[in-house]
């Protein structure tokens, strides 16, 4: 499948594209990169641009807001065509689904959602389809459709935001259960390993990052729990790790601070 025409190699200021950039880790990535002077392509899947991103764009004139449902192949192709002349130095696959948010208001980013439907004996399988579509299918579609943009850039990096819950040896994580979320992150890791193998020849670096137990809007109910990390801290460290990785690191699964995570 070819999602966009080949690009000329053009020297430009560094550009990052972030999926799911309207809240949590994605919004923090957008904010910190914008603060550094990068051009930021911040995507969201809402009908209208969310206030979080319009506020950011009002502060930084190099923030570009785009609507994108990462599970919709035609929509991703359409945006790739629209941005076909834009080299993307760092492509961050951040959009993700963690649990059942069917009872949350569409714009309520603080709603924690429901983990109980991901416990064995109480599994709700339509949710599995949603989680796999966003967490596994989405990053693959986005990485392929925007590959020429990455290839045409100076830095040539693809990042997938994963989780220690994708580790086959890991035992820590969200409340008991979360079967769908855990298996989606394991699949994401293997998927990105394969992407790394396929793109190494082009000098593209692909890594998976575990942000750790991050206190985003949806985890505010965990405020005060030992070990929870501020979003600003994890993102600051992930950016440092992204800066440091090279083609020698492609295919690796790393913690936010660059430490190797177990598969």
Give the ranges of each region predicted by the language model:
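Short beta-loop-alpha junction of Rossmann-like oxidoreductase domains
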Residues: 101, 167-171, 209-222
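Catalytic loop of short-chain dehydrogenase/reductase
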Residues: 97-132, 137-141, 147-200
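Structural signature of the Rossmann-like NAD(P)-dependent dehydrogenase/reductase core
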Residues: 18-19, 93-94, 157-163, 205-210
């Amino acid at each position: 499948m070819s999602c966009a025409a080949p690009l000329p190699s053009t020297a430009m200021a560094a550009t990052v594209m972030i999926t799911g950039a309207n809240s949590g880790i994605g919004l923090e990535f957008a904010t910190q990169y914008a603060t550094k002077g990068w051009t930021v392509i911040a995507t969201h899947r809402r009908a209208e641009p969310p206030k979080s991103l319009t506020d950011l764009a009002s502060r930084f004139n190099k923030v570009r807001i785009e609507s994108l449902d990462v599970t919709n192949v035609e929509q991703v192709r359409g945006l790739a065509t629209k941005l076909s002349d834009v080299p993307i130095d760092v492509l961050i696959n951040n959009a993700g689904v963690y649990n059942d948010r069917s009872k949350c208001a569409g714009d309520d980013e603080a709603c924690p959602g429901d983990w109980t439907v991901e416990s064995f004996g109480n599994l709700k399988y339509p949710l599995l389809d949603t989680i796999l579509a966003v967490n596994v299918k989405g990053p693959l579609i986005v990485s392929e459709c925007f590959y020429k943009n990455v290839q045409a850039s100076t830095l040539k990096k693809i990042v997938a935001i994963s989780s220690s819950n994708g580790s086959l040896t890991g035992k820590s994580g969200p409340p008991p259960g979360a079967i769908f979320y855990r298996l989606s992150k394991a699949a994401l890791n293997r998927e990105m390993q394969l992407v790394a193998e396929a793109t190494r020849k082009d000098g593209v670096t692909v890594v998976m990052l575990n942000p750790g137990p991050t206190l985003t809007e949806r985890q505010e109910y965990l405020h005060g729990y030992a070990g929870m990390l501020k979003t600003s801290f994890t993102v600051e460290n992930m950016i440092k790790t992204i800066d440091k990785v090279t083609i020698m690191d492609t295919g690796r699964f790393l913690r936010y601070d660059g430490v190797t995570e177990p598969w």
